[in-house]
């Protein structure tokens, strides 16, 4: 089963507005998705750029998004320091930050993939986990996934 991931900020395959990039406010865009399959216990989100010169660059990692959530607001006010057990956990991006870091390609047009996963469990990872740790922990627990891709150039 697939999830339909959308944004009010940009259309799949189109340009991401500068507001969400390093040359703008560098805030996260609003995201929304449809109902997950039965049994979903949480969601995870990975945002990355496969066109980065040194290999895929990770811009945002979120996990343990509560199962009842169907959207993330623009400029989501979360950091990696979670004390609420019901809070969304933020992983570490390629800049070493536990936050959203928007598109900032050195040159040319890059593609930015927002990948959402519906999981049959909540994950035992701590805030600050990497994309690689998250992917390993999600193995065997993905019920559905969806993708939204936007482009950006400076």
Segments predicted by a language model, with ranges:
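N-terminus-centered regions that define maturation/targeting leaders and the start
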Residues: 1-154
């Amino acid at each position: 089963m697939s999830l339909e991931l959308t944004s009010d900020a940009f259309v799949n395959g189109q340009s991401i507005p500068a507001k969400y990039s390093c040359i703008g406010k560098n805030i996260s865009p609003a995201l929304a998705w449809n109902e997950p399959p039965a049994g979903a216990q949480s969601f995870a989100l990975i945002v990355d750029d496969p066109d980065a010169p040194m290999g895929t660059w990770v811009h945002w990692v979120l996990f343990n998004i509560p199962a009842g959530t169907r959207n993330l607001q623009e400029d989501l006010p979360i950091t990696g320091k979670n004390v609420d057990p019901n809070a969304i956990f933020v992983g570490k991006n390629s800049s070493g930050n536990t936050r959203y870091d928007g598109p900032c390609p050195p040159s040319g047009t890059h593609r930015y993939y927002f990948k959402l996963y519906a999981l049959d469990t909540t994950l035992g990872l701590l805030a600050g986990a990497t994309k690689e740790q998250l992917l390993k922990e999600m193995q065997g627990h993905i019920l559905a996934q969806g993708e939204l891709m936007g482009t950006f150039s400076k």
